[in-house]
Amino acid sequence: SVGFKAGVKEYKLTYYTPEYKTKDTDILAAFRVTPQPGVPPEEAGAAVAAESSTGTWTTVWTDGLTSLDRYKGRCYHIEPVPGEEDQFIAYVAYPLXLFEEGSVTNMLTSIVGNVFGFKALRALRLEDXRIPTSYIKTFQGPPHGIQVERDKLNKYGRPLLGCTIKPKLGLSAKNYGRAVYECLRGGLDFTKDDENVNSQPFMRWRDRFLFCAEALXKAQAETGEIKGHYLNATAGTCEEMYKRAIFARELGAPIVMHDYLTGGFTANTSLAHYCRDNGLLLHIHRAMHAVIDRQKNHGMHFRVLAKALRMSGGDHIHAGTVVGKLEGERDITLGFVDLLRDDFIEKDRSRGIYFTQDWVSLPGVLPVASGGIHVWHMPALTEIFGDDSVLQFGGGTLGHPWGNAPGAVANRVALEACVQARNEGRDLAAEGNEIIRXASKXSPELAAACEVWKEIRFNFKAVDTL
């Protein structure tokens, strides 16, 4: 009989369409799918496409009230993952009309919403997504971007230097401001609130902002350089977050900070708009990212979170170090670093980039290398990250035996030496240690730092592999 037929049918009949030609306006996603035993990969891929777009588990008569062909997600290609028995990469295309303009929140709710709890799958991971230019154009993106930031700070031709103030919790506002002043006075460009410094009983946010502003003004007057401190505006409500950002602007601070995953994309996008409207730079910390991106077969790869952040807005974002104490495999890290900085990125599976991405001049984001790095890493960091980056040494500045300012001096001298050596055409990878040693002859601060950290190694295998 014609008409409506109730019951359960296989997803692949509707949602697996290998003959589909993707459109320039489609959002494309590459999922790593691990089906339950007995579930064919086509069915698993189709289930992902269905459950993250128009499908549900049974046939419903209201399907007849719309055009599924126009709105459904489609699994258009499946390939086995080399070296893994039961894993497949399923490529899904979503029509643009499924997403609200300018909302990272809505995009993620659709693509990585309910479907990750789906029973027919043992595990599911979103490896990469291709955002069409027409959708990117609905986002403001980073408040300022790399070039505007350099112009604001008047710093060119080298990476920027930062330092997270430690101990991360427990200092009073006055002592905190003192530590900030010493680091900036010694030669750093930025100091940073730790991601969990918000407004706790031992140091309320307003007091911290005031003492940090004093430190900035003093260090700028003495060095003749523009200085910044990432004032963490993250708060329990958006209203409170705005209050902090407004106060930072009133103090004349150049930059504020936000924890974009714990704070949420809605709050982050609001703050990014405020920052562009009011001339504040926005530093983004990725606290909680490893909860989402650490497992190889389930969750979301950081490159997706990085793309989402560039759309939502931020001028700096933490991106691993390749050499320090936290995650990062070199090629994969550089893959998403390029996704953050460049205007156009070619598909390159060896770096984990599944799709060619065109950002249509959306401003870029500076990657921040932070976590367990010290002066001996400087040549490698300069070579790996290049000029458009922020190198952040927390313990690697404050752990200096003579104090914060000498620690900052050591880092600045090491950086300038590496940049000069690179500009002279020397090979930083091969001659790095020699370059640092030569520079330490003329700088007692650097010599002392070299002595302290000469034996430190973090010898663990990288978890983030292809």
UniProtKB/Swiss-Prot annotation:
Q: Name one GO molecular function term.
A: magnesium ion binding
Cell compartments where the protein resides: Plastid, Chloroplast
Pfam families cross-referenced by the UniProt entry: RuBisCO_large, RuBisCO_large_N
- Check the record and name the CDD domains matching this protein: RuBisCO_large_I
Q: Which GO terms describe its cellular component?
A: chloroplast
The reactions it catalyses are: 2 (2R)-3-phosphoglycerate + 2 H(+) = D-ribulose 1,5-bisphosphate + CO2 + H2O; D-ribulose 1,5-bisphosphate + O2 = 2-phosphoglycolate + (2R)-3-phosphoglycerate + 2 H(+)
> Known post-translational modifications?
The disulfide bond which can form in the large chain dimeric partners within the hexadecamer appears to be associated with oxidative stress and protein turnover.
Superkingdom to which the source organism belongs: Eukaryota
The portions of this protein that span the membrane are none
Q: Which InterPro entries match?
A: RuBisCO, RuBisCo_large_chain_AS, RuBisCO_lsu_C, RuBisCO_lsu_C_sf, RuBisCO_lsu_fd_N, RuBisCO_lsu_N_sf, RuBisCO_lsuI
Q: What else is known?
A: The basic functional RuBisCO is composed of a large chain homodimer in a 'head-to-tail' conformation. In form I RuBisCO this homodimer is arranged in a barrel-like tetramer with the small subunits forming a tetrameric 'cap' on each end of the 'barrel'.
The record's section on HAMAP family has: RuBisCO_L_type1
Query: What protein name applies here?
Result: Ribulose bisphosphate carboxylase large chain
* Organism (species): Beaumontia grandiflora
